[in-house]
């Protein structure tokens, strides 16, 4: 019997792709206020490509940006990291049905939670500005416990905290490895959100696929 429905955050409840587009406007306003609009667009494309949808070694990413661009006053990697961690959450773009979905699951008697990879400051800021934390019985951020998806331990840790077995949990996420393989290995029942950087990649016949987050309600009755 399913007792909990758990979610990834980025590209599952939050439209990270659109949030990143909004964040880049603040980034260039703060760090490159004097460059032309054409140069901003060129550098935005650099950030999209080298940022790899957020699946990147951030120190290497920042070093690439610093070294490959001309700067009037070049920031340090530490400054770029602090800016990203403290500003990105101000640009949350939550899928329109995310709050309604979580509220409906709560009304149906399910426990609801989020398991997300990322630095603690960044992810908690995003969660705080998302408006979704109030629906959650548990929030697990990998940076808080030093366990990262796809390690099955982060999924079993969450189930244990809820007083449940992994088999009693559904997990919804977009990443074919971090979310789907990880939750399967832990014993959870995954649902694939087919969106974002990994859309249409490595879909599995044994895992339900949804195109919109509200479609979870068609699977979890």
Spell out what each predicted region is.
Residues 1-5, 18, 33, 99, ...:
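Asp-based, Mg2+/Mn2+-dependent phosphohydrolase catalytic module
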Residues 2-96:
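N-terminal helical cap/lid subdomain that shapes the substrate entry/recognition surface
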Residues 53, 92, 114, 170-171:
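Residue-level marker of alpha-helix boundaries and capping positions
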């Amino acid at each position: 019997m399913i007792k909990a429905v758990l979610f990834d955050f980025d590209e599952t409840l939050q439209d990270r792709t659109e949030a990143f587009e909004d964040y880049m406007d603040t980034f260039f306003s703060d760090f490159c206020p004097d460059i032309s609009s054409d140069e901003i667009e060129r550098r935005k494309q650099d950030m999209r490509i080298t940022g790899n949808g957020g699946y990147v070694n951030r120190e290497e990413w920042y070093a690439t940006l610093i070294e490959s661009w001309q700067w009037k006053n070049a920031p340090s990697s530490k400054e770029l990291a602090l800016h990203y961690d403290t500003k990105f959450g101000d640009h949350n773009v939550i899928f329109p049905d995310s709050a309604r979905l979580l509220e409906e699951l709560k009304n149906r008697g399910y426990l609801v939670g989020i398991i997300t990879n990322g630095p603690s400051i960044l992810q908690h800021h995003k969660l705080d500005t998302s408006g979704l934390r109030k629906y959650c019985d548990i929030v697990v951020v990998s940076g808080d416990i030093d366990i990262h998806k796809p390690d099955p331990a982060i999924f079993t840790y969450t189930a244990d905290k809820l007083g449940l077995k992994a088999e009693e949990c559904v997990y919804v996420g977009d990443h074919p490895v971090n979310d789907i393989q990880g939750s399967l290995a832990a014993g959870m029942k995954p649902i694939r959100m087919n969106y974002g950087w990994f859309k249409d990649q490595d879909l599995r016949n044994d895992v339900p696929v949804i195109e919109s987050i509200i479609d979870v309600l068609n699977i979890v009755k």
